[in-house]
């Protein structure tokens, strides 16, 4: 017979009740903690997530400002396109989606690979563009099937179009797709939010330099959407603010005329108003069409441009680096006069060669018979090398560096473009730093005629000439005429006070300008037969930049050497002489081709500006 131990059973039951109660308490504790965590600690997070399901903030892109020439001619257009975009978090099977969309919107393998690449660097909650520039047929096909594709939308956007193509590419630049580097830069500046609705950003030229002004301010719409992502109603609308319109100093008709003269050449021309630095024309040949860059140029096409031996991507006006040659002789003369090295009455005998004192090193003059007795005026008129060898020897490299840097050589000009090279005005310190060698007197002699280590851009040559025209007032070139926002027009204002070289009242300024006039108008001047008939008066200075050095007993013959080893030819000029309205620099790389020569082109440009009815038939060869 079995007896029950009621006390033991009661204790066991109580233990089980206590354990069960403890488990219930723990479960309720966990539940209460989670409720607290969800309702209190993460209230803001889940409220936001909940609102995102039905309340959306849609950024609205601003209209990009238009760029005009000085006469009000629009140089760019804004055109409306449509893209198709996918919001990743709404898509369960991305591969299946892409397969379904391919026949509807004609997706190419490149479209899909670009999209997958963009997915990796994008938030899954933000739409990612699948394809740009949809056709009307593609839009219609998708509209019929749209209800099948939750998370896929078609959006309109504006793109840039450049109707003048290659003619203005180096000035206007272009806009192109915003890439990761752009986003990082925008984020660093606190501007990323302002590009939430944009595809493109300025990458080159005026489009890049004035990006902040042209872009405008992004607006937004607060909308309520259903569970399919369709807009139910508009809750709030903050319209975007359009970008500013920009008027350039450029004259489109002059630009086109100069380009017609340089067709087929590797060349550059800059035309500037010497009174305020306004750029009237900036031509660099050859050029490129900026339109393919807007939607994204192919690697193959970009590679062709990048490796083209004629360098179409380079703006030769601001990035072309050349020994400035004899175009610097007026500024060398001016510097020597200001430093007291020479006077207007100083004379040297211009022999066929000049010998460096204490050596047997001979430096040749371009004129085999020499020039006879020379003062500074005649030396500039005849571009006498031997005179400037002597001047450079007497000045020394330190004074040359100090004076010529004031004319703007060896540093940026201040032009409102990012694409500019500094050039190089050599100095004793530079050679030691770069070449680890001492400076020799022979180096100085070559610098005296704009050769040797010295390299400059055409825009630097014009800046120096503008300083000469303005009695030493150094004026920065610029492309901006004014900015327009609604009815408000803000004209260009230079930053800071222009630098002044020496005394503006010095008579030497006029003396050197007169010598440049003599170069073009005196019978002994090297440009006489090209320019002396101009009724408005031209002052000029030519230059020939060596591509390779000749041996002491070697004679230069352009017809006997390859084209790309021939000398570069420069012309700088200002006109009308008594009241200059333009300062111009022209370069023909390797002396031009197909019978094109520098002096006649310069004369044609000036006649086009000041004597359009003139007969510009000129001699075939430059002196």
Swiss-Prot record:
Annotated GO CC locations: plasma membrane
Pathway: Cell wall biogenesis; peptidoglycan biosynthesis
UniProt keyword annotation of Cell inner membrane present: yes
Catalytic center residues: 326 (acyl-ester intermediate)
The keyword Calcium is annotated on this UniProt entry: no
Catalyses which reaction(s): Preferential cleavage: (Ac)2-L-Lys-D-Ala-|-D-Ala. Also transpeptidation of peptidyl-alanyl moieties that are N-acyl substituents of D-alanine
Enzyme class: hydrolase
Membrane spanning residue stretches: 17-37
InterPro entries xrefs: Bact_Transpept/Beta-Lactamase (IPR050515), Beta-lactam/transpept-like (IPR012338), PBP_dimer (IPR005311), PBP_dimer_sf (IPR036138), PCN-bd_Tpept (IPR001460), Penicillin-binding_protein_2 (IPR017790)
An example Gene Ontology biological process: regulation of cell shape
Alphabetic keyword roster: Carboxypeptidase, Cell inner membrane, Cell membrane, Cell shape, Cell wall biogenesis/degradation, Hydrolase, Membrane, Peptidoglycan synthesis, Protease, Transmembrane, Transmembrane helix
Highest taxon in the source lineage: Bacteria
One GO MF term attached to the UniProt entry: serine-type D-Ala-D-Ala carboxypeptidase activity
Topological category with respect to the lipid bilayer: Single-pass membrane protein
Intracellular or extracellular location(s): Cell inner membrane
Function: Catalyzes cross-linking of the peptidoglycan cell wall.
HAMAP family, sorted: MrdA_transpept (MF_02081)
Name recorded for this polypeptide: Peptidoglycan D,D-transpeptidase MrdA
